[in-house]
């Protein structure tokens, strides 16, 4: 059993090795085909690809680690292609080709990574163009190369002597591409970019020795499957943190920042925050009028019962104005001074300052004579909301009729006592300051001052 398992394991390892070797062979074939196409489809005579590899052994017996420093890497011949020379006659066929001879010597060369012209081009990831003789337009090109870089490689001298006119070095992929031509080929940036793209994509597809070398020598490079999955982030805090109750529960899959619908955070979908304290003696900010309170559900009547008690207090005290309201000597309050409607102020605050229950009955009688109807509750006039609604209806009814307010002359004050009881309720004995604020009303309101009004207007 153990022997069969070991044999099976060996067979699996052999299968993995065969796959790696076949992949490497396919990569080498693709590289050679690319180098060949560069020479056959252009004016370049030869093409060589130098790969970056670590030195096998250092002095002392210790293996050098990849990437420690530039001295541990080198440029080594990987593959090359040289186009055969076209013989002009049959005698030259058997003759030796000097270009091919110089090309063959390149296969045994080694260059230090980051040193010299070849090493610096590879480390700096750039490209260089070198000509045999400077042209007329570039007379100082040789001096430029000599000053900015190290001296040209000594084997390039043999190449120039064999007939090579242009040498180009381009960093591409995991190595360096060297091209040589027997013609003068000007520098072309588009060609450089095309070569880089071709050899980089070729290297990533075929998986050259260098990529396998780095992944195997480092040993700690993580694979895509070893990366942990993205951890789920905790949900962000709620947008509305109401004190006193838990945040609303969102449906599954819904984000707190993007609710499922517009009603998610609607005011009606959450309870209102409690008032600070919450005692019974503490008044709320808003009070509903008695008419609206009568329409409330039964379970809300008990809650608002203690709120309506302060509202009914002015009725029990004869319609007196609230203590916080300012009064002028003529009896007008701050509210009536702003609105300019003294007859409505009488409905609110009454004609006198301390009439007691009699003033309350006078206010009710004046409300019936003014056309408001006896069926309505007098408390409605104590609410600012109902008062404003009644005032608007009175203005719309009297918009087409004549109405003016004048100060009652002193000599006519005695005649007002013989008027109908409905008007005497509104002209009850009052301080002299308030008698000056009395009004004349139109015929539709009482029918008692029509003759006086016409006489006064004439």
UniProtKB/Swiss-Prot annotation:
Residues 1-17 have a biased composition (Gly residues). Residues 220-232, 308-317, 413-436 have a biased composition (Low complexity). Disruption phenotype: Defects in root growth. Residues 1-21, 220-325, 354-374, 386-458 are annotated as: Disordered. Expressed in root tips. Expressed at high levels in the meristematic zone and at low levels in the elongation zone of the root tip. Keywords: Cytoplasm, Nucleus, Stress response, Transcription, Transcription regulation. It comes from the Eukaryota. Disulfide bonds: none annotated. Transmembrane segments: none annotated. Residues 245-262 have a biased composition (Pro residues). It holds the Pfam family bHLH-MYC_N. GO terms for cellular component: cytoplasm; nucleus. Coiled coil: none annotated. It is found in: Nucleus; Cytoplasm. Interacts with BHLH094, BHLH089, TIFY11A/JAZ9 and TIFY11C/JAZ11. Forms a ternary complex with TIFY11A/JAZ9 and BHLH094 in the nucleus. Involved in the repression of jasmonate (JA)-induced genes. Forms a ternary complex with TIFY11A/JAZ9 and BHLH094 to negatively regulate JA-responsive genes. Involved in transcriptional regulation in the root tip. Plays a regulatory role in root cell elongation. Regulates root cell elongation during salt stress. PANTHER family: GB|AAF34833.1. This is Protein RICE SALT SENSITIVE 3.
């Amino acid at each position: 059993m153990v022997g069969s398992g070991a044999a099976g394991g060996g067979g699996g390892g052999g299968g993995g090795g065969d796959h790696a070797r076949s992949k490497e062979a396919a990569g080498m074939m693709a590289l050679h085909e690319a180098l060949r196409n560069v020479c056959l489809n252009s004016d370049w005579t030869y093409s060589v690809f130098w790969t970056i590899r670590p030195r096998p052994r250092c002095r002392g017996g210790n293996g050098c680690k990849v990437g420690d420093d530039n001295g541990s890497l080198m440029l080594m011949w990987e593959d090359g292609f040289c186009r055969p020379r076209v013989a002009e006659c049959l005698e030259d066929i058997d003759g030796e080709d000097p270009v091919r001879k110089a090309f063959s010597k390149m296969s045994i060369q080694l260059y230090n990574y980051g040193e010299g012209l070849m090493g610096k081009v590879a480390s700096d990831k750039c490209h260089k163009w070198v000509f045999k003789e400077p042209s007329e337009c570039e007379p100082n090109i040789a001096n430029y190369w000599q000053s900015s870089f190290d001296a040209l490689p000594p084997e390039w001298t043999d190449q120039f002597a064999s007939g090579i006119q242009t040498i180009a070095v381009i960093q591409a992929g995991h190595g360096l591409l060297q091209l040589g031509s027997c013609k003068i080929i000007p520098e072309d940036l588009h060609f450089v970019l095309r070569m880089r793209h071709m050899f980089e994509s070729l290297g990533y597809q075929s998986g050259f020795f260098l990529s396998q070398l780095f992944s195997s020598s480092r040993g700690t490079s993580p694979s895509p499957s070893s990366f942990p999955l993205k951890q789920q982030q905790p949900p962000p805090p709620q947008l509305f943190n109401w004190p006193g109750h838990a945040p609303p529960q969102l449906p599954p899959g819904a984000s707190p920042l993007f609710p499922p619908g517009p009603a998610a955070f609607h005011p009606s979908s959450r309870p209102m925050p409690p008032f600070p304290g919450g005692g019974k003696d503490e008044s709320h900010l808003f009070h509903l009028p008695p008419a609206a309170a009568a329409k409330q559900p039964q379970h809300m009547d008990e809650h608002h019962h203690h709120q309506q008690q302060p509202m009914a207090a002015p009725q029990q005290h004869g319609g007196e104005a609230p203590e916080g309201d300012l009064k002028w000597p003529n009896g007008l309050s701050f509210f009536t001074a702003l609105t300019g409607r003294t007859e409505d102020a009488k409905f609110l605050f009454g004609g006198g300052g301390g009439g007691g229950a009699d003033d309350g009955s006078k206010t009710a009688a004046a409300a019936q004579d003014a056309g408001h109807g006896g069926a309505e509750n007098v408390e409605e006039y104590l609410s600012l909301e109902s008062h404003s609604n009644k005032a608007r209806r009175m203005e719309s009814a009297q918009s087409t009729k004549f109405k003016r307010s004048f100060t009652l002359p002193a000599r006519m004050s005695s005649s007002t006592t013989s008027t109908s009881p409905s008007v005497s309720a509104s002209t009850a004995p009052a301080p002299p300051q308030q008698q000056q604020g009395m009004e004349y009303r139109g015929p539709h309101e009482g029918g008692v001052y029509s003759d006086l009004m016409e006489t006064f207007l004439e």
